[in-house]
């Protein structure tokens, strides 16, 4: 199950999360999660705004993430956003437990 964060702002609930497509979109725009600790201010704003794209794209157009950031974010959210951002990549390397359709491979060096 995909990890999400649900927030309420101005009496409206928003679901934040990432998909392969939204991570790809952020990478194409120049975001690199490996630089998050070197550029924390930019990274938290980019991650927070990007987390709206999967479920709440209209909110980004209406500048809702910017309004929320101006009011402040919980410190713990930075780590959770990074964890959620990495989830689609981790999912690529997981295979189903039933064995059906799983890739079989062998490396020779």
Where are these regions (language model features)?
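Charged interaction scaffolds used for protein-protein
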Residues: 1-9, 13, 24, 29-38, ...
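Short linear motifs in exposed loops
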Residues: 17-18
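Short, hydrophobic/amphipathic alpha-helical patches that form generic packing surfaces
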Residues: 43-54, 83
């Amino acid at each position: 199950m995909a990890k999400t964060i649900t927030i309420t702002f101005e009496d409206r609930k928003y679901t934040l999360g990432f998909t392969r497509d939204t991570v790809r979109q952020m990478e194409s725009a120049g975001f690199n999660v490996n630089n998050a600790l070197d550029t924390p201010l930019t990274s938290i704003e980019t991650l927070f705004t990007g987390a709206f794209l999967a479920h709440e794209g209209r909110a980004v157009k209406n500048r809702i993430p910017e309004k929320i950031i101006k009011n402040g974010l919980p410190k713990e959210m930075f780590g959770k956003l990074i964890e959620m951002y990495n989830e689609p990549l981790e999912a690529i390397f997981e295979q189903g437990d039933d064995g059906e359709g799983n890739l079989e491979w062998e490396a020779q060096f």
